[in-house]
Amino acid sequence: AEEKSIEVFAKNLSQLLMESPLSGKTILGWDPAFRTGCKLAVIDSTGKVLETSLIYPTEPQNKVKESEKVVLDLIKKYDVDVIAIGNGTASRESEEIVANIIKNTSVEYIIVNEAGASVYSASKLADEEFPDFNEGERSAVSIARRLQDPLAELVKIDPKSIGVGQYQHDMNQKQLNESLGGVVERVVNEVGVDLNTASSSLLNYVSGITKSTAKNIISYREENGKFDNRKELLNVKKLGKKTFEQCAGFVKIDNPQHPLDNTTIHPESYDAAVKLLDKLGYTLADIGSNNLKLDNLDYEELSDQLDIGVITLQDIVKELKKPGRD
């Protein structure tokens, strides 16, 4: 029974981590509460925090008008696209307030599962990441980032706090931890990580990337803005050719300059991918579209014609069919 339960947790965790990201948006995270006020944080499309605030629109203070002004000012100042509301205490009340505030704007709102956000806010990792923020501000950031890139944010939290199952504390903790850790690695290897939203915790799971390299990638992104292509990684401090070769197939870019940068196809196989597409009458522009028909291919024959290994071809086709977790 225990093994079965661990299996169920692993499956639930995998589903949570594979949830679709919401890329390219500016998001306002809203951590709802009553007495202590609602904490707000605005993040840009790379997850960088632009501003935080605290408002009291709920009971007992009911400062709805003042709160509305703060929220509308933030929306205007940063061109906010979406508000992510945590689903904890005062979530329903917050939802009503938000719906009312944004009714004359093009902003949308989404309720986000905030399980584990408070555990993260009080963690050593959050202290390192946001030394100057209080726990409420950290929670609001975490809620916004969960909507933007669930995988990047959830890997910061002990899987047992994300609420993936009941009675997990009665189990063999070593087995449970190994199983859940394995899930994260598998997801990272299967779908890759978005180079422009990945947290340092997530980058640590990528082959070849150490803790310090992960921090350097984040610093580079904060200073220079989004990565436009994978090759830019070579500009990151202490990230040499060898590390690039190890990690390049697992880091992806949304809306990249080179369409293959949004797949887990390794740059070393780009020529092979282009040759294959060309042979089948497609171009790079067809990637991810419905035009691309890649079923029932004769891999042996293609392998001979293109001088590319069968396994490499199969991997390329698998990726061309599904760039990432959309």
Model-derived features: positions:
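Conserved phosphate/pyrophosphate-binding and hydrolysis machinery centered on Walker-type P-loop NTPases
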Residues: 2-7, 30-33, 84, 88-91, ...
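Short glycine-rich, Thr/Ser-proximal phosphate-binding strand/loop in the N-terminal lobe
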Residues: 42-62
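Accessory alpha-helical DNA-binding modules that contact the DNA backbone or grooves
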Residues: 190-326
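Conserved phosphate-handling catalytic cores of large alpha/beta enzymes
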Residues: 63-84, 89-192
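Conserved, well-folded catalytic cores of nucleic-acid-processing
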Residues: 16-20, 46, 74-81, 86, ...
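A glycine-rich phosphate-binding loop feature that marks nucleotide/adenosyl-phosphate handling sites
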Residues: 30-34, 88-93, 112-119, 160-173, ...
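Gly/Thr-rich phosphate-binding beta-strand-loop-beta motif of the actin/hexokinase/Hsp70
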Residues: 21-49, 147
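Extended, highly charged clamp/arch subdomains and adjacent linkers
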Residues: 1-26, 45, 68-72
